[in-house]
Amino acid sequence: MSNAVQPSVTSPPVAPGGERPGRLFFHSFTFERSPSGRGTAHIVLEFAGKQWSGRAEGQSSPIGDLRLGAEAAMHAVEDFAARSLGLELMGVKLIRAFDANVVIVSATQRAARDVKLVGCYLADEDAMRGAALAVLNATNRVLGNYLTTR
């Protein structure tokens, strides 16, 4: 038996409105394909009871749909940060790893001398939603810094 002290696990404090302070939350994601082959991705993010959305539209294809999901998330993050982060989506990949589908996104933050950002998400059920969530994972630290300095 070890004598090591086990750290206690606590939940972050919850503000009176039920919100956890200091985090941008994923609210919803939708993707629609038109009969003409166009795809539209829409994401809603939430912070302190307010919502920010991002939308991306383009030609629908398996790879193009992933990019639309990621671009919609990038637009929502930039909208939340009043376009001050200088984020740019570089690429999106869906790979099979460890018997699971994983979406990986690569982005840069031009406002910080081209800092490279990478995020991933296990996307077995919905790869387009996974691409949007991978963007949120990639930008998590940048958003945390933004929130502490605003």
What is each PLM-predicted segment?
Residues S36-R38, G64, L68, D126, ...:
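Conserved active-site and cofactor/substrate-binding residues in soluble primary-metabolism enzymes
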Residues H75-A127:
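Short, solvent-exposed interaction modules
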Residues F26-A41, Q51-S53, A81, L85-R96:
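Conserved P-loop NTPase/AAA+ ATPase motor core
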Residues M1-S11, E46-K50, L147-R150:
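Intrinsically disordered, low-complexity regions
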Residues M1-A41:
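Non-catalytic linker/capping segments at the edges of enzyme domains
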Residues S53, A111-R150:
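Mixed-charge, glycine-accented linear interaction segment located at domain edges/termini
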Residues L45, G49-D79:
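Acidic (E/D-rich), amphipathic helical modules within compact regulatory domains
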Residues F31-W52, N101-R113:
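Short beta-strand elements
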